[in-house]
Amino acid sequence: RIFFAFIWIIGRVLLWIYRVDVKGLENLPKHSVLLCPNHSTDLDPVLIGLCLPLDYHLHFMAKAELFDNRALAWLIRTLGAFPVQRDGKDIQSIKTAMQVLHKGENLLIFPEGTTIRGGVGYHDGLPAHAHAGIAMIGVRTGATLVPVFCDGQKKPFHKTRIIFGEPYVPEVTGRRGTSEELQAIADEMLRQAYA
């Protein structure tokens, strides 16, 4: 935790360099929160994490390839990351995500599943698509979902906005909801992130 605190302090200086304008932190509950940001660059989870209080206990999924480098794997694990295979069949990462939320800690998952290209809200020129898995994790754990907007201007001295939206606890049919309900929840989180 000492190393993490050191990184966090250095990171807060970087927020000033990147001119990050943060709004909506008052919207965040303290426990079992599932942050649902749009995904514009690889720096998004780091910038969002640095906006939060030091004791917020944020975890996030990171593509498994990043863990191939031992030094990088150690660093991102220290920052709260755990690996996910992005073929959509990684049961272990889903279990880990649910364990994080059941423990009362907080989790960041990108509804789009990957960084976007082609403009805000678009991926390769097509409208961004939300994956229903984020809603499934939220519903099964009873987590509070919070949409987050990152504007993607990650150049030094160019203003960047990070906006935390209103918290949302989804209501579904039964304990798990239908596939249509879960997709609608995921779509709504992404829509609110871009609103």
Predicted regions and their residues:
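Flexible, charged surface loops at secondary-structure boundaries
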Residues: 27-31, 101-102
